[in-house]
Amino acid sequence: METFKDVISSDQLVLVDFFATWCQPCKMMHPILEQVKEVLGDRIRIIKVDVDKYRVAASQYGIQSVPTLMLFRHGEVLWRTSGVMQKSELLATIDPFLR
């Protein structure tokens, strides 16, 4: 079974959505992330991490608020933000990292 560390350490660009089931803005991000995945396909991997279930990972990356989005490649944090982002804004942010 793949671990969180395995996933973020890969060659592929990985967008991690740190969320909570009780968080209303997190629920708003869900369809936006699905749309981003539709546009980018295999060029990115998107995973969701429930901060209440995976407290160690959330703590390790200093997650203070949800949703928090982080981009990883080779285990390195390339970018991070907290709060809801619109699809166009998120795609524009990710695009330079796809090259």
Predicted features and spans:
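A short beta-strand-turn-helix
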Residues: 1-14, 55
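Structural microenvironment flanking redox-active thiols in thiol-disulfide oxidoreductases
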Residues: 51-58
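Short pre-active-site segment immediately N-terminal to redox-active cysteine/selenocysteine motifs
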Residues: 12, 19-22, 65
